Each structure stands twice: as structure tokens, then as C-alpha cells.
Amino acid sequence: PVAISGTHGKTTTTSMLSHIALAADLDPTISVGGILKAIEGNIRVGGPDLFITEACEYTNSFLHFFPKIGIILNVDADHLDFFKDLDDIRNSFHLFAKLLPENGTLVINGDIDKIEEITSDLSCRVITFGKEASLNYSAANITYNEQGNASFDVVKDGQNVAHLALAVGGEHNVYNALAAIAVADILGVPAETIQTGLASFHGTDRRFEYKGEVGGVTIIDDYAHHPTEIAATLKSAAHYPHKKLWCIFQPHTYTRTKALFSEFAEALAHADHVILADIYAARETDTLGISSTQLADAVKEHGCDATYLPSFAAIEEFVTTHCQPGDLLITMGAGDVVTIGEDLLKA
């Protein structure tokens, strides 16, 4: 089995690797945490030789896997209702890496802070990818087309081995792709087939998903609910054609909003205008004294226009009167904020 872990990018990377495996006729069995159009769902039952699955760290659930190849995309502070702190999270990923057998391989982002705490005393082979040219797999000469989709050279152990073009946007997806490329390389998939697979991947539901256009305003929906994801999505949007960038953000859980409050404010300020909906409680009942009004004020301190509105109806009315033709509007969050864009398109 190939188990794909990390705080962010699991669904996208699992989907990218699945597309490559399908293009290579490897008949993969697939389990992905989002709807993947290529398999018309989130599960594909294929042959017994290759199982590609997402592996989530929440409640240490990924420690119940038996992977032969493991990916760690990144390690960030999240799920702090379960983990004590970042050291606790790092230790969890270390335990995940230790699951890999001697003849197994860990593919890990070499840019992870204190990576040695994860990779120490492992019996498996370790392969790195990331921004630094000294890593096993890195990307050079990254360029973006008018849709914000990246093309780049794949550099393996210092040698330029391929030039690839993605059909999804953002720098973060270059590194998600590198992880998928590294595993595909281990599986013996040729570069041309890797390119075919990646070119056929246009994203999963709720990951920078184009919803439509109304009154000249383009509406995108994105699942980002952690500051790192928010910043990555808004930076991706900067490469997308637009006049002003609007972000309607619905914070997800009081615990996360409180723990990462200043990081949220800084990340959201990458937009031109931010509209905050009420916090989506999910499994929580205690508000911890935190509110979207406070977050709006914190975003303003970064010099960004921010507004809190108490209902989806009020938000829909506000953007209808304030957005201009040519603007880009992103609904963002892991709750039900997607319905705002869908309502606007129905209007």
C-alpha cells in the first residue's frame, strides 16, 4: 500500500498519484478523501498489487495502516483539540514513518522543520522532495499560465529529468505533484506517462473549484480551513485573471480559530476584501470566547478590508452590491459556506 499523509494536500496528492497510476494501467485500488471525477467517487476497487490511500493523522488514525510506501507532505499545527502541540504532532508522524518496513520507502518533504525528529532511527529508505535543490526531487523554472497553472522542470538528484505541466494552480501543487512523481518513479512509471496522468487531473471537489460566473464575477470554492491552506489558495488566486480578490471565509471550529488566530488574520490579508461568516462549530459546543468579529478586526490590522456579517443572506446581499465585473470571489472553509456561491449563481 501507498499511504499519503500530511497536514495539507493529502486529497490532492492521492488524486494526482491515482491519475498517474490509472494512466500507467496499474489497475490501482484507491481510497481518497474527496470526490475524484476520474473514478466517479472516492473509492475504486482495482487489483491487489497497488493500493493508494489517504492517511489522516487526526486521532492517530493513520497508525493503523501497514504501508510499503509512505508520503509525508508537511507537518503543521492542526487538530489541536486532539494533539497537545506541534511536538506531539511531529511525534505522531514519526510513529507513522516507523510503520514502514526495511524494504519500504518514506517520501518526505525535506523542507519540514525539525525533519530529523521524524526521520531518526527508521529502518526504511528515505527519499526527499521540496524547494531545496539538494533534495532528491525538486522543481526548477516554475512558470504559470493565465489560469495560474504551473509548469516546471523536475530535478532528480541534481539532474533535470522532465518538464511537466499541471492542470491545477498554485505553487503548493507543484510540491504535491513532486511527492506523487517520486512515488510514481519508485513504481517504475515512465516520465511521459506521469505527464499524461498529471495533465488529466483538474482538481477534486472543493479544491479551487470553479463554480460559475454571475454578473461578470467569477465564483470559486475552496475547502481551505487552516492558515497555511488559506495563504496557498489566495496566492494561487493571484495568478488567476481578476480585478479584486474577495474571500468569504467561514472559520472551522472554535479550537482551531483560537489556537491559530493571528495566523488566520495574516493569511486572510492576502485577499483584497475579506468577509467573515460565523464560526462553524462542527463537533464543538464551547465558543472559547472567540468570534468572527474579532477575526475581522485582526485582518484589518494587516491593512486589509474586512467585514463580519451575521448570516449567509446578509453576505449574499453585500457581495451582490459590492462586487464588480471582473472580480474573483472565493467561498472558503470546511463547513457549508459553499452554499453562498451556489445561491448567488441561482439568483
Predicted regions mapped to residue ranges:
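A glycine-rich beta-strand to alpha-helix segment
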Residues: 314-345
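Beta-strand->loop->alpha-helix junctions that form or flank phosphate-binding loops
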Residues: 31-34, 123-146, 165-171, 195-199, ...
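Short internal beta-strands
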Residues: 105-110, 247-250, 270-281
